[in-house]
Amino acid sequence: MIDAEGYRPNVGIILCNPQGEVFWARRIGQDSWQFPQGGIKKDESPEEALFRELKEEVGLPPEAVEIVAGTRGWLRYRLPKKMIRYDSHPVCVGQKQKWFMLQLLADESEICTNYTDKPEFDGWRWVSYWYPLGQVVSFKREVYRRAMREFAPVLFKREES
């Protein structure tokens, strides 16, 4: 499902533990780390996609988390030219993402990145909130910055309570 401008709808997930750290996952077979994310299927709401992706990529059911916040609108990133598949139709030039911040309610031992037969991650760790901005691939960095800036007041206000 690609929109008229060539962007694929997608959800991004920032999962927080009680200490305010965020879930940071290593892409399988690569030295590349990111937040969980995934496409929104036809006739699926962003929230439905969020919970499907959370189960597929992190192994957590909806009751294991609480949605703390969602971005007000779509955040977009464009793929580098070398990653665009010009032979596919329609051509996907990037992702438009609805981001969600989740609070982990379950024990972290329930996290399972090999829940499906085709896992996306082969490792994970908790990192400080702003750490991902210096580590994520450059073409996703501005979207991460915008989502994290929007969510920071919510997270840090919760920590003060």
Curated annotation (Swiss-Prot):
The UniProt annotation puts motif Nudix box at 38-59
| Residue ranges constituting the Nudix hydrolase domain according to the UniProt record | 6-149
Q: Which cofactor does it need?
A: a divalent metal cation
Q: Tell me which domain of life the UniProt entry assigns to the organism this sequence originates from.
A: Bacteria
The EC number(s) given in the record are: 3.6.1.-
Q: Which InterPro entries match?
A: Nudix_hydrolase, NUDIX_hydrolase-like_dom_sf, NUDIX_hydrolase_CS, NUDIX_hydrolase_dom, RppH
Keyword annotations: Hydrolase
The keyword Hydrolase belongs to this UniProt entry's keyword annotation? yes
- State any single GO MF term: pyrophosphatase activity
| Pfam families reported in the protein's UniProt record | NUDIX (PF00293)
Q: Which SUPFAM superfamilies match?
A: Nudix
User: Which top EC class applies here?
Assistant: hydrolase
Family the UniProt entry places it in: Belongs to the Nudix hydrolase family. RppH subfamily.
Give a short account of what the protein does. Answer: Accelerates the degradation of transcripts by removing pyrophosphate from the 5'-end of triphosphorylated RNA, leading to a more labile monophosphorylated state that can stimulate subsequent ribonuclease cleavage.
- Name used for this protein in its record: RNA pyrophosphohydrolase
Q: Which gene encodes it?
A: rppH
